[in-house]
Amino acid sequence: MSTPLNVVALSGGTSRPSRTLALTEAILAELAEHLHIKPHLIELGEIARPLGSALWRSELPEAVEQQLRLVEKADLLVVTTPVYRGSFTGHFKHLFDLIGQDALVDTPVLLAATGGSERHALVLDHQLRPLFSFLQALTLPIGVFASQAEMADYRVSSAALAARIRLAAERAVPLFGAHHALRKSA
């Protein structure tokens, strides 16, 4: 079997449990159904305090620096953020402010977000996509937005949301060629 893809998923929520973490895990699980991956999950809540107190990358503790290096070396990056006041969180943005300017050039990024209602769904295209375009990453054409109504007990509970997650994962497969795709027996 081929070398697994290094998939790094950043769950941008700061609490646990969280719908953002649940969505991130559901996306990783679906990607694993279609691609041979080695997943790495970064929970922003676990590094938020030391991350937030650093103005410069050189001020980060080594454990947080390691997480940033994982992001920079990803073959595929999955980013999921809760939506607050129409945008991603400040800690989420601060993490990407500390990522090397050219570190994500041509890195495929699957965008995802959670929000209280569908009125936040445009955050994918109006907030996240411009951020990663600036970083010259390759944002995947299908993102995943999950509203509060589509999740129950911190799990995907909507067939429509599950279908969007599946579509996003399926659309990621061609980027990595047949040697990373998992063969499904009929």
Curated annotation (Swiss-Prot):
<dbReference type="Pfam" id="PF03358">
    <property type="entry name" value="FMN_red"/>
</dbReference>
<dbReference type="InterPro" id="IPR029039">
    <property type="entry name" value="Flavoprotein-like_sf"/>
</dbReference>
<comment type="similarity">
    <text>Belongs to the SsuE family.</text>
</comment>
<protein>
    <recommendedName>
        <fullName>NADH-dependent FMN reductase SfnE</fullName>
        <ecNumber>1.5.1.42</ecNumber>
    </recommendedName>
</protein>
<dbReference type="GO" id="GO:0016655">
    <property type="term" value="F:oxidoreductase activity, acting on NAD(P)H, quinone or similar compound as acceptor"/>
</dbReference>
<keyword id="KW-0285">Flavoprotein</keyword>
<dbReference type="InterPro" id="IPR051814">
    <property type="entry name" value="NAD(P)H-dep_FMN_reductase"/>
</dbReference>
<dbReference type="InterPro" id="IPR019912">
    <property type="entry name" value="FMN_Rdtase_MsuE-like"/>
</dbReference>
<dbReference type="InterPro" id="IPR005025">
    <property type="entry name" value="FMN_Rdtase-like_dom"/>
</dbReference>
<keyword id="KW-0560">Oxidoreductase</keyword>
<keyword id="KW-0520">NAD</keyword>
<keyword id="KW-0288">FMN</keyword>
<dbReference type="GO" id="GO:0052874">
    <property type="term" value="F:FMN reductase (NADH) activity"/>
</dbReference>
<comment type="function">
    <text>Involved in the dimethyl sulfide degradation pathway. Catalyzes the NADH-dependent reduction of FMN.</text>
</comment>
